[in-house]
Amino acid sequence: MTLNKTDRIVITLGTQIVGGKYVPGSPLPAEAELCEEFETSRNIIREVFRSLMAKRLIEMKRYRGAFVAPRNQWNYLDTDV
């Protein structure tokens, strides 16, 4: 099965979060940086953030960006986590 760009980025960032590249409480790179890194649009990155929030891996803070959620909030029933 072929994954779309959004799914590939969700898997990549999710793996980095679970693997410890980004520790709980730390910020993820800004939307613009992620757009550049993954060569995609802001709409795709926002969709990625929505997916990661649904998995409870990140929290969005208004005017501050995306932050890694505490481990006790992660949705361990999700197979991607």
Model-found features: residue ranges?
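Short linear motifs at protein or domain termini
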Residues: 1-81
